[in-house]
Amino acid sequence: MKKLLTLIVIFCIAAIADEPVAALKLLSIGNSFSVNAHKYLGEIIKQHGKATAVLGNAAIGGCSFKRHWDEHLKSVADPAHKPYRYKGKPMSLRDYLTAEKWDVVTIQSVSHQSYKPELWQPYADNLVALIKELAPQAKIYIHRTWAYRPDNFRFFGPKKNKFSAQLMYEQSGAAYKALSEKYNAPMIPSGEALWTAFQEQPVKNVSPDPAFDYKNPVHPNLPKDDGALIKGYYWKKDPKTQEWKFTFDGIHANSRGEYLLGCTWYAYFFKQNLDDLAWQPKDVTPEDAKFLRSIAQRVAAQAAK
């Protein structure tokens, strides 16, 4: 009888854990990678019509654990120092953490330190302590970020054989896993989602494009980049000279990547089935969107186990 009751309790807990979430207040303390993750999240929630959310993003481009903590100390010393914005208003980190009764607060490393956990402390510990002090009701999650494009310049040069996108993925994953275990904080599988989609997608990305002249590019031509989830090459106008510059971003998610990230966060936090989500960004085809949603659903389900 005891065994039966135990099994019933376990089954009930599992069933409750898998119930769709109808409403959530979620704050990210991050950088451009949390901006990528949030880009389409609100629209996905709205278009699916099965949940509501309050989303906050205390983000500064290139912001590490250390910088977030330093910004907080500056705000303590000078209350006028408010480096973040929420609903159009300047905010300190204290302001942000107390602006809503957040259900979830996510934290993450800056990407170029994501595989260097020796640079995270004591700043990550300090931020976690601050969250627990100012938002004790919130559950802390670790945002496991992604590896750069395989053709990112960071992987080339004299040490090119010692580092790669594969190694960045593996090493950052190990570092985030250790942080997750330290704080008993679940890990959001953004890195897994982008990596899995890149490996399994039917259209494989080929970079560099053998037909493109990278040394003598002509505006507005761009290399073929089908299957990319991270931006790659683009043209940018110099505000001073008004000349077009051939530019490379091997770090940030493109529209496909941002849609995949949004779907992953939605499936992970709201436990929603994406089969009947009919919305996607204009530059993502319905067929591709279906594939990306399937990856998001699977990766989110695996991470929630």
Question: Which positions does each model-derived feature cover?
Answer:
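Short hydrophobic segments within beta-strands
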Residues: 27-29, 143
